[in-house]
Amino acid sequence: LWKT
């Protein structure tokens, strides 16, 4: 999971 990416937090961008």
From Swiss-Prot:
GO cellular component: extracellular region
Example GO molecular function: calcium channel regulator activity
Tissue specificity field: Expressed by the venom gland.
Protein name per its UniProtKB record: Tetrapandin-2
Record keywords, A-Z: Calcium channel impairing toxin, Ion channel impairing toxin, Secreted, Toxin
Main subcellular localisation: secreted
General function of this protein: Specific inhibitor of store-operated non-voltage-gated calcium channels.
Keyword Transport applies: no
Transmembrane segments: none
UniProt-annotated location(s): Secreted
